[in-house]
Amino acid sequence: MTDYSSKEYFDKLEKFWRAANYLSVGQLYLKDNPLLKRDIKPEDVKVHPIGHWGTIPGQNYIYAHLNRVINKYGVNMFYVEGPGHGGQVMVSNSYLDGSYTEAYPAITQDEEGMKKLFKQFSWPGGVASHAAPVTPGSIHEGGELGYSLSHGVGAILDNPDQIAAVVVGDGEAETGPLAASWQHNRFINPITDGAVLPILDINGYKLSNPSLTSRMSDEELTEFFHGQHWDPYFVEGDDSEAMDPKMAEVMDKAIEKIQEIQKNARENHDETMPYWPVIVFRSPKGWTGPKTWDNKVIEGTFRAHQIPIPVDQKNLEHVDALIDWMKSYKPEELFDENGRVLPEIAEIAPKGEKRMASNPITNGGVNPTDLNLPDYRDYAVDTTKRGQNIKQDMLVWSDYLRDVITKNPTNFRMFGPDETMSNRLYGLFEVTNRQFVAPIKKDWDEALAPEGRILDAQLSEHSAEGWLETYTLTGRHGIFTSYEAFLRVVDSMITQHFKWLRKADELDWRNDYPSLNLVSTSTSFQQDHNGYTHQDPGLLTHLAEKKPEFIREYLPADANSLLAISPLVMNDRNKINLIIASKQPRPQFYSMEEAEVLAKNGLGIIDWASTTNGEEPDVVFAAAGTEPNMESLAAINILHDNFPDLKIRFINVVDLLKLQSPKVNPNGLSDEEFDRYFTKDKPVIFTFHGFEDLIRSIFFDRHNHNLHVHGYREEGDITTPFDMRVLNELDRFHLAQDTINSIPEFAEKGADFSQQMDNTLERHYQYIRDNGDDLPEVTNWTWKDVN
């Protein structure tokens, strides 16, 4: 029986660590001569060594000891690399345990494979200096700091047999998202979820400044973590052999504590919030590397952050120092003559799917399944009298989502920053609660329970987005709903997720993922008491600038349209789906059959709102969004009343990026299809929920440039719903006026009409200031048939 705390085992562990360090240094500098069998020549060295050293040895040490507890306790564990610029860590360790070669057979576990391994790192056509999708075992790249712990938690939700070993960099720990993440333990259910083991990796320095936690004593950190309901364990040193027994003891205690918490919770149904373990690990930055250089201290300082020794292909003056550094790891004790890791070292790596880089959770999840969806038609809204049935789209949709939860009790969740109720998803609470493991005050709290399918009890967009990202990367499904303006808080996170999807899609060995579904509600065009700060539809533009193969933007005009796109979104793969949906009472216009056609085609000509009678239109109205649709229809009523001979074509757009040219978007309409909708030269009055330049950019590649866009113009205030549209000239009166002015044969005889619209707008201006409400002709408007 293996003694995992014997000197013999620790000796093997030390060699494994040294081998990982050797491989990590080699990846920085070399592209040939990986075993240093001969003198280094210029052609052995990279022209521009690129990468980082400072965080590597400490993480390699942690990784080796995590392998030890995997072997000892048989746990399923995966590694989340929080510190920035530590790309070699997961590459080197997965190469040593064989999982890297399984993903990349050309990178063999011998001298030739090691040569390729070294050359490809931070090399054109090679691999990144972060834990990018090309890295086996990674679900978190770490290029943008702050999300490691939320990613670890998202992955272990509903995965009760998994442990996320989350290494938190001491620089990363200073970011806002990571600071919020220490409160994630309040949402981990010890019965139904797995566990996270955070390891705060304190090496003292960031890029050029000291890390703040490194200037805190163990007592201060203990107080901090106890206050956050964690149980801290400390390991510190710079002598690895002396540290091994202590590190092993702390790791053992942490794993046993996790197992004890879970055993008690699962056997006794004890959902009390536990004190989960956290490890605080202190080691020098750039540990085992050059001690000094040019009379300045390197190891243990910020100077170890990147490339410690100035050696490159054109500058071999100090190559002896590089050789001494690499030989300090005694490669002859680690690899045989052919470059294969020695059997006694290889044998201590976990085997099969117990290897962290081969854990299936890191490659699309453990037994992922599609959603079992209810029939969205069962929730259809009656639109027999168009526009007269007033409903809240999100409220209607919540009944559908309620039944999605019922049918998928372990692989579907809703996420948000304390906004699920505000966003009118009332139906969810008929069947589930907000998951909340912290103490609950039953007399005052609402819909809180230790187990629930809603995670929105932390007011942090970063947390909700981070949880959803890895919940989907590990094969499950979810939706993040948020106020429209504050999805912008995480637009950089969303960009990072897009970059992950794009790069992962290029890898044959990577399984695909359920799509990331974002719902933007509490939208800009009705904020009531919130005002200007809550008005920003810019995520539409932000995402439209990404590779369109991975982005969909849906703007359903009413509840049936929202329902009709649901199956397209719910079981979609490898995309980011953005849905703009209204939570306010709005007229319902489209039958379910019409909504299905719009969802399938992305857009459609609405015959009942058009007055062309099969002829060429004088003007094309197009609407993308709830308020744009409503105001366009109201404008059509005004125009038809005043100009009954005006031939109007009305188009409702649901899938916005379908309008992009196929030169930009392979899913886009051909020029011929586009012209059939929008003509080649007739004026197009395009009403849009977002910033106008996005529509202008779409039309730039098309024949028809006779475009008049009415969207969000960065005008806002605390005001009435209709006045928000007036401020941005997205209202029916401005639209009708612009329509007549854009058609030469109507513009001259329409002068009086244009003045009439101005007069109405002036009356509106005064009325809302006198009465605090919109004009009766606006609030009481209903659709009048134009055919």
From Swiss-Prot:
Its EC number is 4.1.2.-. One of its GO terms (molecular function) is aldehyde-lyase activity. Its cofactor is thiamine diphosphate. Keywords: Lyase, Thiamine pyrophosphate. Coiled coil: none annotated. Belongs to the XFP family. This is Probable phosphoketolase. It comes from Pediococcus pentosaceus (strain ATCC 25745 / CCUG 21536 / LMG 10740 / 183-1w).
